Amino acid sequence: MARQQEPRKPFKSRPNPLDAAEITYIDYKDTDLLRRFVSDRGKIRGRRVTRISARQQRQVAAAIKNAREMALLPYTGSPAGT
């Protein structure tokens, strides 16, 4: 016998956080903004998680990499003990 499918939950759209804050230029020196797009392990979060467009994702990734190179952001996350 086939299992009955449960009805799907309605899709809940979340707005683009950069468009909502009216941010047009992503600066590598704005570490507070960039930290929102980096996981606690230091990985750059994906588009599905952050809800930003493909172009914005490329700009954020480039800004994070520049900030890491300039030692404004760490390459890895903070240690678990701190």
Curated annotation (Swiss-Prot):
Q: Which gene encodes it?
A: rpsR1
Q: Does the keyword Ribosomal protein apply?
A: yes
Annotated disulfide bonds: none
PROSITE patterns hit by this protein: RIBOSOMAL_S18 (PS00057)
Q: Which organism is it from?
A: Streptomyces griseus subsp. griseus (strain JCM 4626 / CBS 651.72 / NBRC 13350 / KCC S-0626 / ISP 5235)
Q: Name one GO molecular function term.
A: structural constituent of ribosome
Where does the UniProt annotation place the signal sequence? none
Q: Tell me, how does this one assemble?
A: Part of the 30S ribosomal subunit. Forms a tight heterodimer with protein bS6.
Query: Which GO cellular component terms, listed alphabetically, does the Swiss-Prot or TrEMBL entry include?
Result: cytosolic small ribosomal subunit
Among InterPro entries, the record links this protein to: Ribosomal_bS18, Ribosomal_bS18_CS, Ribosomal_bS18_sf
Segments traversing the membrane: none
Name a single GO biological process: translation
Keywords associated with the record: Ribonucleoprotein, Ribosomal protein, RNA-binding, rRNA-binding
Family membership noted in the UniProt record: Belongs to the bacterial ribosomal protein bS18 family.
Name of this chain's protein: Small ribosomal subunit protein bS18A
